[in-house]
Amino acid sequence: MGNYKSRPTQTCTDEWKKKVSESYVITIERLEDDLKIKEKELTELRNIFGSDEAFSKVNLNYHTENGLSLLHLCCICGGNKSHIRTLMLKGLRPSRLTRNGFTALHLAVYKDNAELITSLLHGGADIQQVGYGGLTALHIATIAGHLEAADVLLQHGANVNIQDAVFFTPLHIAAYYGHEQVTRLLLKFGADVNVSGEVGDRPLHLASAKGFLNIAKLLMEEGSKADVNAQDNEDHVPLHFCSRFGHHDIVKYLLQNDLEVQPHVVNIYGDTPLHLACYNGKFEVAKEIIQISGTESLTKENIFSETAFHSACTYGKSIDLVKFLLDQNVININHQGRDGHTGLHSACYHGHIHLVQFLLDNGADMNLVACDPSRSSGEKDEQTCLMWAYEKGHDAIVTLLKHYKRPQDELPCNEYSQPGGDGSYVSVPSPLGKIKSMTKEKADILLLRAGLPSHFHLQLSEIEFHEIIGSGSFGKVYKGRCRNKIVAIKRYRANTYCSKSDVDMFCREVSILCQLNHPCVIQFVGACLNDPSQFAIVTQYISGGSLFSLLHEQKRILDLQSKLIIAVDVARGMEYLHNLTQPIIHRDLNRSLKYLSAFCCCPNHLFLTAHTIYLLAP
């Protein structure tokens, strides 16, 4: 049994295929590099290949800095079959490689020039000669998707099943890149559909992973039928790959066409195709597998003690998928894997707070414990989902679990002990949570400094503080002077509480206020950003005070016209906020947050803080 917490997100096959993909990208880059000729040199070469007289006088030993001979250049710069024949008769070797590792035949194939390919082959070029990466000319034609070039090579006896340095045949490459017509041609010339690559991958594995349905169908045709249940070195079958990457049409084709697919087969990690669909949030694929093949896969656990339900909770971004799996009435929401961990453990460990809330609302038991399988049998290390969240620094989830703590539990609501442990308590911020918060805050501040226009950057030395005119949990508000203007200064305390810090609110508030410009919204003057201990937001000072002060402290009586002026100005400010490209909702519109320039005189101003603003997507 494997340790869930050490479950790899990438398999060995994934790592290998990434390297294979990179190698083919490099191959194309090297081919393109060979095709790059300096403009002056290119003009001269075109003149040579465009004139029989000039060509007859050319130095046969000529070559470029990249090691391109005249034979290579003939394939790039407008040469013809006559030039090829002449150069080869005069002794230029077609086997010579450029510094990037390609013959003239490779370059002619990459340029898709059937005439030059034929001429080179008739002149004695080795059709099976390998260049960079163990690639033959047929491999190059397949990578580029050049149907005509591939056809000429096959007509002249190219080995259709030859393998390159990563043991890919041309058919592997055609399936990988989705070259349907080239695939059809290769099959016509007898390509082996079941030959294995370096990690046991067949062309059908590649087509299934990349989502090429038509190629998958070609590979399954009678006469060259691929083994639909063939396993690679990690026991993946094609259904594993199309399920993992969400290729619903291929999943449906494999399951519905009497192909004798084994839908519940497992890889070396114990994953069924349904597991992989759920680990990657492929809801439609998961539904298709269950609807066609039944619910057998739902009860299977992989080596990390996870059912498909656990897998969906590990992914955590599709509550609809989790709900669908629970609706099958096969797995209980509190089902524990062999190591004891539940879907709630998985969601907590990966920080999926919305899923955690959904599971708790639907009866998930936060007191169930998991055991660490890496410990020896004599040691008992039982952990609740809260401990898993705490370990990963997901402090918001720890706080949420506090809210949902069962009333019969005797521990205080703000402290937790580990069941079966030594009674030690956990509290937020967790060590990792604190590090995450600090790292995020530093990044947020740097981004804010970079994005805030320079005229909004203030130094604390530029500000003259006068009397205090307000206070709150964030700090204090002062009346003062800045750049020869009377202003209001909101001075922050640089402390962190719970899971949301003043730094976060400060950055949020500044980033929004700096974009606002309307006569009925308090004007932003600037901010001090140098250090959290000096954080301050400077805004326009409104001399008339708040509407609350006017009505309840000064006991002023407003006439109807003044009330209408105030109401209209507030509405104008709200309309401006709501009609921004990214609309803003003022979530706490009350008398304390409406300020008056002077008694009964417009404009009246809306005051926004990080607590009262809410951004809507455009």
Swiss-Prot record:
SUPFAM superfamilies: Ankyrin repeat, Protein kinase-like (PK-like). Its EC number is 2.7.11.1. Belongs to the protein kinase superfamily. TKL Ser/Thr protein kinase family. MAP kinase kinase kinase subfamily. ATP binds at I469, G470, S471, G472, S473, F474, G475, K476, V477, K490. Autophosphorylated. It comes from Pongo abelii (Sumatran orangutan). It is found in: Nucleus; Cytoplasm. Interacts with TNNI3, ACTC, ACTA1, MYBPC3, AIP, FABP3 and HADHB. This is Serine/threonine-protein kinase TNNI3K. The active site is at D588. May play a role in cardiac physiology. Keywords: ANK repeat, ATP-binding, Coiled coil, Cytoplasm, Kinase, Lipoprotein, Magnesium, Metal-binding, Myristate, Nucleotide-binding, Nucleus, Phosphoprotein, Repeat, Serine/threonine-protein kinase, Transferase. Its main location: nucleus. It comes from the Eukaryota. InterPro entries: Ankyrin_rpt, Ankyrin_rpt-contain_sf, Kinase-like_dom_sf, Prot_kinase_dom, Protein_kinase_ATP_BS, Ser-Thr/Tyr_kinase_cat_dom. The lineage of its organism: Eukaryota, Metazoa, Chordata, Craniata, Vertebrata. SMART domains: ANK (SM00248). It catalyses: L-seryl-[protein] + ATP = O-phospho-L-seryl-[protein] + ADP + H(+); L-threonyl-[protein] + ATP = O-phospho-L-threonyl-[protein] + ADP + H(+). ANK repeats lie at residues 66-96, 100-129, 133-162, 166-195, 199-228, 234-263, 269-298, 304-335, 339-368, 381-410.
